[in-house]
Amino acid sequence: EAAGVRVGGIALAVPGPVDAERSRVIRPARMPGWDGINVAEAITEQCGLPALIENDARAGAIGESVYRRRLQGVTPIDTLIYVKAGSAIGGAYLVDGVPQVGQGGLAGDISHIPVEAAAGRPCKCGNVGCLETIASADSIRADLAASGLVYENNAQLLAAARDGIPEVATAIRQAGTLLGHCVAHLVSFLAPEGVIVGGALSAVDAFTAGVRAALHQSCLPSIMEH
């Protein structure tokens, strides 16, 4: 207000399945206490401003699509698969810039796709063998701790990656490779204009290199050429 700017509303990106039409979080594995809560209503009650919520990966996908349209000399990508790779894994799919939400807003959540490499690993969702248990920053840190390399948080893990610690770089690239092979199935089925990886791990070259190599290895050349 002091700067002469009026806040018109609040938008909140939530790390879990979201029914945006009803402004409710749906059984979030990492935030069980939020299940069924009308978050937008709670924000409005506290702040007196209109509010809306969206899944964080879906919001990231929309942001990437809109941002690229505003950049000169950059080809817009409006039909895309977006993967958020950070402490957890998330995903979204846009067609012509419109997020595909699916029944109840649950579309795009690739984190709990079962993958063979994760067989037997328990996931916070209650299942075993989910992608998130082998491709997220939390899972990388847990695996390194089991081998004697302990990092207190993911910020320390990423700092070690930037410092070029070989064991960390290897573990992060492996996670990127496993994620890439999973995403390759989606690319082959949906044939999007592009795949965008966001989240904290996307800033690590070893991770994105693993994703890219897996996509080229697992997808038809004709799809990758486009």
Residues of each region from the PLM?
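ATP-binding/phosphotransfer module of carbohydrate and carboxylate kinases, centering on a glycine-rich
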Residues: 1-8, 21, 45-49, 68-77, ...
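Phosphate-binding/catalytic loop of phosphoryl-transfer enzymes
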Residues: 6-13, 17-133
